[in-house]
């Protein structure tokens, strides 16, 4: 009745769903009591105020259909008749709109005509204040500004060294001018000796300062590199499970590896070339003093470099994008192939995999070659401009010398100064591919660093878990356009109770435990532990107090002891051994040559499946969690290992709430209560013998199948 009553107020339903989308929990009845004063549903003003009270930033706008693809989705399409609905995605290529019908509680795909018929032009954009803060800290080139400010002292030292280098670069041409115009004409050997010694001193200082600048600059950029690498890894581990489930492993690895491109850019010569270019204005002033005409030729060449770069850059960027996509495909396929090597060999499909790899590799090489060709064209274009300017300057300079407007020494000095101006431009133009590549890398890496992490609403300082669990009116789906996985699930689990959950595959058993671990926030309803809403809890606080054993567990390439004591490396050995005994792992560990110091190999490859599973069980037990989840944990065990664990089950369950998910009913028959699920709903619950009395029930049917 409560759900139906809320369904009548589609504005309240929409607010609930959008709040859950932004990881914010709310009590619909409380919102209704505060803001629906006349009982007719939330008005537009009341809706905006209610959103503000939930720390949501909501904005009512009017937007033409042709511009809907530019707004942040999901958003609420507000209708004056109260028939509001959610706009989830705009497919501009096919003119389709993915919406969520709040009245029917189901996603819908509307054509252009269908959407135009129901769209009245009003939209409410919703973002969480946490996401707004996140946007302000968005990772792009501006991310490096605070880093530069942080190390401003070091960069100031680099700037001072650069000034001295430019002064030395300015002095050298003047020495050559004096030699040409004075020394050679007047045969001044003493002056020549003095200039030679002075020039040698300048060269020595220039070499020392240049090396010092490179050292200081590399030292500071290495610090920034370390900060970025540390930030990236911390952020990666704090991303929600959904991020990894929606992306290929190889694609994520490829994006992380883009850090290498940024690192090479920071530690290379590109940024020092930019510094050198900034000092070109001083050289231009001196060059103008020598010859305004020759200086205008140099100045006139600069727009040519810029226009050439503007012409090449968009094409180069597109081809770099294509190259990255092909590289990411190769990375993903390689990771998939290596991790699936047992299946590949068992099914003898190596030729098919090789054929696929050859095609993907050919595609990557082709895209890489196109990038190289275009980069070469860009560099040769720069060389053409440079050579053309050199020829013009030679012709014009010779005319000025012949006419007496310029001496030979001044012409040589001018050419040396122009070289100091053009050299940074040439280096930057030749490094333009690196600039484009690092821009792509920042964008790709930004996909990781700009993805929202698991948010901690309120960061409540909650006490130690006791073990009472409550699922209230839970409705959940993994994506807005995906089918409902859990539908109106209500379940109370008392502290210390052992609960078995059974049902067909896809009935929602494992999804319940994922909600309990706060991997996801339910679309509707609340998950409570000891009366505390998990949507408001710190996920790390929660997960440290829940032990989980899955059907397929991953062990790290460390010793058995380190794997068991993963959450606390300094854990006493006695606790490790006790947990191993409870899990039935101590005996086989003791028989190993290195015992608990045995390295298990990557993902536990050095152990059998049953041995890996028992170590995983010991790892879940070692922290003495108040809530323990066994998700098909014994299905991979042989009967002897399972028998050992089942014998210890009473000790394992003592003093904690236990949830056993299993297909084999023998695993759960001794549970205090058995929950039977079908199509996302609880259809039966009771003890083993009670459920068998219902001969028409699903549990009896599954039991009969296993007996047969």
Swiss-Prot record:
Changing residue 340 to A: In strain: Serotype A1 / PH101 and Serotype A1 / PH8. Belongs to the ABC transporter superfamily. Protein-1 exporter (TC 3.A.1.109) family. Part of the ABC transporter complex LktBD involved in leukotoxin export. Transmembrane domains (TMD) form a pore in the inner membrane and the ATP-binding domain (NBD) is responsible for energy generation. Homodimer. It is an enzyme of class 7 (translocase). This is Leukotoxin translocation ATP-binding protein LktB. GO terms for cellular component: plasma membrane; type I protein secretion system complex. Residues 1-126 form the Peptidase C39 domain. Pfam families: ABC_membrane, ABC_tran, Peptidase_C39. Changing residue 112 to T: In strain: Serotype A1 / PH101. Residues 469-704 form the ABC transporter domain. Its EC number is 7.4.2.5. Changing residue 597 to T: In strain: Serotype A1 / PH101. It comes from Mannheimia haemolytica (Pasteurella haemolytica). GO terms for molecular function: ABC-type transporter activity; ATP binding; ATP hydrolysis activity; ATPase-coupled lipid transmembrane transporter activity. Residues 155-437 form the ABC transmembrane type-1 domain. Keywords: ATP-binding, Cell inner membrane, Cell membrane, Membrane, Nucleotide-binding, Translocase, Transmembrane, Transmembrane helix, Transport. It is found in: Cell inner membrane. GO terms for biological process: protein secretion by the type I secretion system; proteolysis. The chain crosses the membrane at residues 159-179, 192-212, 270-290, 296-316, 389-409. ATP binds at residues 503-510. In LktB the peptidase C39 domain, the ATP-binding domain (NBD) and the transmembrane domain (TMD) are fused. The keyword Nucleotide-binding applies. It comes from the Bacteria. It is a multi-pass membrane protein. It catalyses: ATP + H2O + proteinSide 1 = ADP + phosphate + proteinSide 2.
